[in-house]
């Protein structure tokens, strides 16, 4: 078997996670967020596995066009909207919805001649202060969109939460109240809830939920695990041992002689490194799953390899599988060891890692 790392994607896990989220929000439609190459799981792979989703959320127009070219006919929404007037005919031609969050987008809609109107989701800045129109701007912007012949009616309404992944933080309630007050009585769909909103803030679920990381079996909350919500990891990042070596006490290993063995042991070298997207800053003790147990990384992660301490009496051999994260070793646990979030780990795999449906 090829010793190089691969990300094995489970279609059944993706479908299980979609079903679990529907159960969490039975009155809502699901806008499956597949931006950033399906959170590293493969854009078309994920979309085809989640064909029963009601729509897909994307960050960029090229992602939406790839889905249309791949035969995806569901509703598509550009979560950051469009950036050039020349994008608008593509939205029309490929039946792609757009978020409008900035005055420049509004002006382009007003000034461009289109063959038919575009479906717009007006983004309200309810407190995240990143994208969207402030409550003070909302009424004027809404009226301009209503008057614009290039905008399909009704206009849909959305916001995004800053702290929904902190279940005890009341700021999410503040944002919900601001959004609901501002949009009361207006027609159109409403969408507020990301993964954390769908899982932890049921009152935010609205007409559509927009789950991202949860679809891939990962909890959005630090210290939590997707399995606690009936979610199954969709990615197994696997490689192999390409060397097993006896190692003497007081001998270092790796660049900079960063780690020194306290006793005689056996070391395993795994064929994965920062050239594959595994973080170079993974500290000593970060777990890897080998033959049914966690073994710690020792020494520095290099471009193509990392080293694990298998233990003095280990019987592991060259060619044995090494799981970097997956069902047996949740990516949330690995991320916590490294001091990052699971989102970053799954989306930063490089093209050297083969992504395949398992």
Swiss-Prot record:
Location of the active site: 35 (proton acceptor), 255 (proton acceptor)
Disulfide cysteine pairs (residue numbers): none
Cofactor: pyridoxal 5'-phosphate
GO terms for cellular component: cytosol
Transmembrane segments: none
GO MF term (any one): pyridoxal phosphate binding
SUPFAM superfamilies: Alanine racemase C-terminal domain-like, PLP-binding barrel
Domain of life: Bacteria
UniProt entry keywords in alphabetical sequence: Isomerase, Pyridoxal phosphate
InterPro entries from the UniProt entry: Ala_racemase (IPR000821), Ala_racemase/Decarboxylase_C (IPR009006), Ala_racemase_C (IPR011079), Ala_racemase_N (IPR001608), Ala_racemase_pyridoxalP-BS (IPR020622), PLP-binding_barrel (IPR029066)
Entry-annotated residues carrying N6-(pyridoxal phosphate)lysine: 35
Binding site for substrate: 130, 303
EC category name: isomerase
Pathway membership, UniProt: Amino-acid biosynthesis; D-alanine biosynthesis; D-alanine from L-alanine: step 1/1
Entry's Gene Ontology BP terms: D-alanine biosynthetic process
Entry-linked CDD domains: PLPDE_III_AR_proteobact
Catalytic activity: L-alanine = D-alanine
EC number(s) recorded for this UniProt protein: 5.1.1.1
Family: Belongs to the alanine racemase family.
Annotated function: Catalyzes the interconversion of L-alanine and D-alanine. May also act on other amino acids.
Protein known as: Alanine racemase
Organism expressing this protein natively: Shewanella baltica (strain OS223)
Native organism taxonomy: Bacteria, Pseudomonadati, Pseudomonadota, Gammaproteobacteria, Alteromonadales
């Amino acid at each position: 078997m090829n010793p190089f790392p691969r990300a094995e994607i489970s279609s059944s896990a993706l479908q299980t996670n979609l079903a679990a989220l529907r159960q969490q929000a039975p009155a809502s439609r699901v806008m499956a967020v597949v931006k950033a190459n399906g959170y590293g799981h493969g854009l078309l792979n994920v979309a085809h596995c989640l064909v029963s989703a009601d729509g897909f959320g994307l960050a960029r127009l090229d992602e939406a066009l790839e889905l249309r070219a791949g035969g995806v006919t569901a509703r598509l929404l550009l979560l950051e909207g469009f950036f050039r007037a020349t994008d608008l005919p593509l939205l029309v031609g490929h039946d792609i919805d757009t978020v409008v969050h900035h005055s420049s987008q509004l002006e382009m809609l007003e000034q461009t001649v289109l063959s038919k109107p575009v479906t717009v989701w007006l983004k309200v800045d309810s407190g995240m202060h990143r994208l969207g129109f402030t409550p003070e701007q909302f009424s004027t912007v809404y009226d301009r969109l209503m008057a614009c012949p290039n905008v399909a009616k009704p206009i849909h309404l959305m916001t995004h939460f800053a702290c929904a992944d902190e279940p005890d933080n009341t700021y999410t309630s503040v944002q919900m109240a601001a959004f609901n007050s501002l949009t009361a009585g207006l027609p159109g769909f409403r969408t507020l809830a990301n993964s954390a909103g769908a899982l932890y803030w049921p009152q935010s679920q609205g007409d559509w939920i927009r789950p991202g990381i949860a679809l891939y079996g990962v909890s959005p909350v630090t210290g939590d695990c997707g399995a606690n919500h009936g979610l199954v990891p969709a990615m197994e990042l696997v490689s192999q041992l390409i060397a097993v070596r006896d190692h003497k006490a007081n001998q270092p290993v790796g660049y900079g002689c960063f780690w020194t063995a306290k006793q005689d042991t056996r070391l395993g070298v795994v064929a994965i490194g920062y050239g594959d997207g595994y973080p170079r800053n993974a500290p000593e003790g970060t777990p890897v799953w080998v033959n049914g147990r966690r073994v710690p990384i020792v020494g520095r992660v290099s471009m193509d390899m990392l080293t694990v301490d298998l233990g003095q009496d280990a019987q592991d051999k060259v060619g044995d599988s090494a799981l970097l994260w997956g069902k047996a070793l949740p990516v949330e646990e690995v991320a916590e060891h490294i001091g990052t979030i699971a989102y970053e780990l799954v989306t930063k795999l490089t093209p050297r890692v083969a992504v395949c449906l398992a």
